[in-house]
């Protein structure tokens, strides 16, 4: 499936101004864009706020590390875990609530070559990765999208005219220099790694920005829910949501106790700070 088959209409901030366990299933089938890569979300997990969800980073209150989760809805909360991985969340509820949805897996619908180039070194092997594995799991998804510590707090809501945010295809110029004469449309993000002759530009989205697009919402009959992956508390809370039968969904793994520093907490572990 390509981006051209999906709606490029941006989701409004009000979409995220709800409890995370309501937002999470509605995110399935939506498209998260960052830079040249776009991912159709197929698996997510909801995390609640302070005093509500023992598995959430915000359970014990606000800290410098989780401060973005207490900010406005629709921003990216990106954190480092296990000393090696980044994971990305979308903040929910009004400012001050400390709730978010972890984006766990998805299908690359634009920027496949860029995603593959980012993932291959991380995979530590020369064999070609199957397309389904490029964003299969939260750390892999963050790598594919190029999300790092500096993107923590990035706004993923497009505030401009929805009509201005649309894909264009064809020979539109050099993807490395958008916005200049002869080099593609102004204020656009180049979304493929196949060269300008076959490029897709998402017009209206400044280069390097993020956005959540309408995509194609998952059929409710295909949505499944169950316990969250790897959490040691609130183990039975069914706030992991996925599209049944989609090959990009990551396998479920129960929590396995391990010794690690407090700085290397997993998605489902409450940080000690």
Positions of PLM-derived features:
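Conserved, well-structured core segments that form or line functional sites
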Residues: 2-179, 183-273
């Amino acid at each position: 499936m390509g981006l051209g088959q999906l709606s490029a209409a941006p989701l409004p901030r009000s979409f995220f101004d709800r409890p995370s366990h309501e937002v999470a299933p509605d995110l399935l089938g939506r498209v998260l864009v960052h830079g040249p890569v776009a991912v159709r979300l197929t698996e997510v997990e909801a995390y609640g706020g302070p005093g509500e969800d023992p598995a959430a980073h915000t359970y014990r209150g606000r800290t410098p590390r989780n401060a973005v989760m207490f900010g406005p809805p629709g921003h990216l909360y990106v954190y480092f875990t296990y000393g090696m991985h980044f994971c990305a969340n979308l903040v929910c509820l009004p400012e001050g609530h400390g709730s978010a949805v972890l984006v766990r897996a998805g299908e690359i619908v634009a920027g496949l070559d860029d995603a593959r180039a980012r993932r291959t070194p991380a995979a530590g092997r020369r064999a070609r990765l199957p397309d389904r594995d490029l964003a299969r799991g939260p750390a892999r998804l963050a790598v594919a999208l190029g999300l790092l510590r500096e993107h923590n707090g990035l706004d993923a809501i497009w505030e401009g005219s929805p009509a201005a945010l649309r894909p264009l295809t064809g020979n539109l110029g050099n993807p490395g220099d958008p916005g200049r004469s002869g080099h593609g449309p102004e204020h656009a993000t180049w979304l493929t790694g196949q060269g300008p002759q076959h490029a897709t530009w998402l017009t209206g989205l400044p280069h390097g920005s993020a956005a959540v697009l309408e995509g194609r919402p998952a059929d409710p009959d295909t949505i499944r829910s169950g316990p969250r992956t790897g959490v040691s508390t609130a183990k039975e809370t069914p706030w992991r949501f996925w599209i049944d039968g989609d090959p990009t969904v990551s396998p479920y793994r129960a929590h396995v106790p391990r010794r690690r520093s407090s700085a290397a907490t997993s998605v489902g572990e409450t940080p000690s700070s």
